[in-house]
Amino acid sequence: MSAPEILLARHGETEWSRDLRHTGRTDVPLTERGREQAAALRPRLAEREFTRALTSPLARARETCELAGLGDRAELRPELVELDYGDAEGMTTDQLRERYPGWTIWTHPTPSAETFDEVEARLNPLIAELQQTDGDVAIFAHGHILRVLAALWIGLPPQGGSRLALATGKLSALGWERETQVIRAWNT
C-alpha cells in the first residue's frame, strides 16, 4: 500500500483573481471560466478514493469542491480561509507598490493584515492532523494559504510559499518519501 497523499486544489478563477486583486476574506464567486476549471478537476479526482475532503468556508472554495465532485463529503475548515490581507484586500500589487515601494505579500505586511506567525499558528494543528491521516485527503482552498501550507509541510517558514506559484483550478500533492514530508506534485 502506498503512503497517503494530501491533494491541494486551488479554487477556480474569480473576477478578482483574474484581475490580479488580492482576494482574502471577500467572498467573491467563481467566474464561468472558474466553474469550468473546477469541473475539470472532477475526472482527475474521480480516479482516487478520498477518506476526507476539507474546504475553506468561502464560497469560491466550496463551489470548486462541489463541482469537482467531493461536495457531498466536504468538511468546512475555518483554518483554510485565505490570508487576511488587511488594507491590501481588493488591491493589485501595482496599487500597493504605489503606497509601499517594493511591497510583496511575503515581505511587507500591510496595516491590519494577518501576520505569517498567525497563519502558521492556525495551520500547524491541521498539519499535525494530516500527518496522522490513513488515507488520501483532498483540500480545497486559496492560493496563498495553500502555498504556506505546502511550505510548512516541507519544513520551510511560511514565506517559503513565495517560491511556489499556484494557478487557479490547479492541483498539487503533498506526501511522504519514506519518513520525509515532500511535495509530490505542484501546480498541475
Label the predicted regions.
Residues M1-P4, L83-Q95, A151-T188:
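Acidic, low-complexity terminal tails and accessory targeting/binding regions
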Residues A3, A39-Y100, T104:
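Phosphate-coordination/substrate-recognition cap region in phosphate-metabolizing enzymes
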Residues I6, D134-F140:
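Residue-level preference for the first positions of well-ordered beta-strands
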Residues I6-T64, P111-N124:
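Loop-to-helix element that buttresses phosphate recognition and phosphoryl-transfer chemistry
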Residues A46-E49, L130-G135:
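Glycine-rich phosphate-binding loop signature in dinucleotide/nucleotide-binding domains
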Residues S56-L58, E79, F140-H144, W186:
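Short, well-ordered beta-to-alpha junction loops that form the rim of enzyme active sites
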Residues E98-E118:
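Short glycine/proline- and acidic residue-enriched helix-loop micro-motifs
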Residues G143-R147, E177:
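GST superfamily/GST-like fold recognition
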